[in-house]
C-alpha cells in the first residue's frame, strides 16, 4: 500500500510539472513586424501595421497588413489585406489573398478587390463620404526568405 502511494504521488508530481511547464513554451500566434504612420495627403493619414499571423513549416507564411485611416485626426475606417506566401530561399510567390474593411464616422468602405501577382498580394477599395472618395491601396511582397515589405 505504501509503495502504491509513492508511485501515485510521483505520477501526480510528473503530470503537474509538465502541465505547469507547457505555458512557458507557448508562443503568440501573431508577431508584429512593423508599425508606422503614412501621410496620404489632403489631411488623410494611415497607421499601418504588418503582422506575421501564421507560419506553416519552413516554406510558407501568412501576413496581414492593416491600415487605420484618419481624416484631420478623426478615425474614418480600416482596411486589412491578408496574404499567404510560399518561399524556398531562391524564389517566392503569393499563393492567396483576402481582405476586409469598414468605414466609420460617416465614411463607407466598398469596391474591394484582392489579387496576387508573382511575389506580391494586393487590395484595392474606396472610402467614401458624400462626394469625397479616397482610394485604398495595400500591397505586401515577400522575398525568397519569407520576409515581407
Per-segment meaning from a language model:
Residues 1-73:
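N-terminal prepro-regions of secreted/extracellular proteins
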Amino acid at each position: 500500500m505504501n509503495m502504491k502511494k509513492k508511485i501515485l504521488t510521483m505520477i501526480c508530481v510528473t503530470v503537474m510539472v509538465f502541465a505547469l511547464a507547457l505555458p512557458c513554451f507557448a508562443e503568440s500566434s501573431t508577431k508584429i513586424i512593423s508599425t508606422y504612420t503614412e501621410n496620404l495627403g489632403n489631411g488623410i493619414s494611415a497607421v499601418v501595421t504588418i503582422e506575421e499571423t501564421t507560419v506553416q513549416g519552413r516554406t510558407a507564411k501568412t501576413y496581414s497588413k492593416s491600415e487605420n485611416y484618419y481624416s484631420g485626426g478623426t478615425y474614418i475606417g480600416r482596411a486589412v489585406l491578408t496574404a499567404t506566401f510560399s518561399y524556398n530561399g531562391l524564389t517566392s510567390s503569393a499563393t492567396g489573398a483576402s481582405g476586409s474593411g469598414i468605414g466609420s464616422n460617416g465614411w463607407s468602405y466598398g469596391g474591394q478587390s484582392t489579387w496576387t501577382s508573382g511575389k506580391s498580394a494586393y487590395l484595392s477599395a474606396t472610402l467614401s463620404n458624400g462626394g469625397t472618395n479616397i482610394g485604398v491601396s495595400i500591397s505586401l511582397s515577400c522575398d525568397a526568405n519569407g520576409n515581407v515589405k
